[in-house]
């Protein structure tokens, strides 16, 4: 059942997951389509997530956006009023202060993560939640798995001291699994869909931005999701018996790596299980 509508406000809207955005030419969604998207969300009782580009929107757009309950996903370069802030670098050359009340998403390549993971503890002090997204998880090798396991163990050691405080930090790679008792995945195509600036619906932003992506309907004619059952957990034979509940189970990566939207790649499965194991070890260390 649909719960969320993700609206890309511009062709250059910030990527916030595993995918990249190769588009460089600004192209705003039309005001007509923006209004229609909000009306649809109201009718279907959907929470709207607006994904912003790296520039300030015209005032008229902001006025329309404020007519509905929503969440703002913004790049760190232009994040005034953001609920979720997206970054893609570990350094903070401009001296921006992190907001203790905001959620931060750090998109990073594996080598950068392996080199800078010691900064995670420092970041957790200053944010409400930190999500780290490995943008090249599909390239993991056996050596990378070993390194990832080691890094997660080091991070768990860092977090153990934090967990002795009154508030346990929220960090997707380690603390999510501790709090879950069922799958909590991306669920694109089932619990959320994306509206692109061209007025068409897509499973997620990656399907709009990829050269081999496909639409699943439009505002005028409604949704047309072929084999929609394949996006549901009930039709994911491997995942529905898994207990790595924090796994993103990225639908786009599934299709990219296995050609099946309901079948994750080896790389996704192994990294998710390493996170689950590290989370278990951390939980056992907490007094």
Regions found by a protein language model. Name each.
Residues 6, 25-31, 196, 258-259, ...:
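Extracellular/mature segments of secreted proteins
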Residues 13-16, 76-80, 87, 106-108, ...:
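Active-site pocket-lining/capping segments in soluble small-molecule metabolic enzymes
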Residues 208-287:
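Flexible mid-to-C-terminal extensions adjoining Fe-S/redox cofactors in radical SAM and related proteins
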Residues 6-18, 56-57, 133, 170, ...:
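Class I S-adenosyl-L-methionine
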Residues 129, 138-211:
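A C-terminal junction/extension of Radical SAM enzymes
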Residues 32-143:
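Radical SAM/AdoMet-radical enzyme domain recognition
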Residues 1-36, 40-44, 249:
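Canonical Radical SAM [4Fe-4S] cluster-binding loop centered on the CxxxCxxC motif
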Residues 21-23, 134-138, 175:
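Short, histidine-centered active-site or binding-site loop motifs used for metal coordination
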């Amino acid at each position: 059942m649909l719960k969320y509508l993700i609206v890309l406000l511009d062709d250059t809207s910030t990527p916030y997951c595993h995918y990249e955005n190769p588009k460089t030419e600004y192209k705003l969604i039309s005001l007509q389509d923006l209004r229609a998207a909000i009306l649809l969300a109201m009718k279907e009782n959907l929470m709207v997530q607006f994904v912003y580009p790296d520039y300030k929107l015209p005032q008229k757009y902001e006025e329309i956006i404020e007519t509905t309950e929503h969440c703002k996903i913004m790049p760190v370069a232009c994040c005034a009023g953001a609920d979720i802030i997206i970054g893609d670098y570990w350094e903070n050359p401009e001296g921006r202060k992190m907001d203790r009340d905001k959620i931060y998403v750090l998109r990073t390549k594996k080598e950068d993560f392996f080199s800078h993971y010691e900064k995670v503890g420092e970041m957790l002090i200053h944010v409400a939640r930190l999500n780290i997204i490995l943008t090249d998880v599909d390239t993991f090798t056996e050596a990378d798995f070993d390194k990832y396991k080691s890094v997660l163990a080091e991070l768990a050691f860092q977090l153990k001291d934090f967990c002795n405080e009154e508030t346990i930090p929220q960090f997707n790679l380690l603390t999510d699994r501790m709090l879950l008792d069922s799958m909590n995945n991306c669920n694109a195509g089932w619990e959320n869909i994306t509206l692109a600036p061209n007025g068409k619906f897509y499973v997620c932003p990656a399907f709009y931005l990829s050269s081999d992506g496909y639409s699943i309907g439009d505002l005028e004619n409604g949704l047309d999701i072929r084999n929609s059952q394949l996006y549901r957990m009930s039709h994911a034979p491997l995942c529905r018996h898994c207990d790595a509940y924090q796994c993103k189970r990225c639908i786009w990566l599934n299709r990219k790596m296995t050609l099946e939207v309901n079948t994750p790649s080896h790389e996704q499965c192994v990294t998710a299980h390493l996170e689950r194991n590290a989370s278990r070890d951390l939980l056992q260390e907490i007094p």
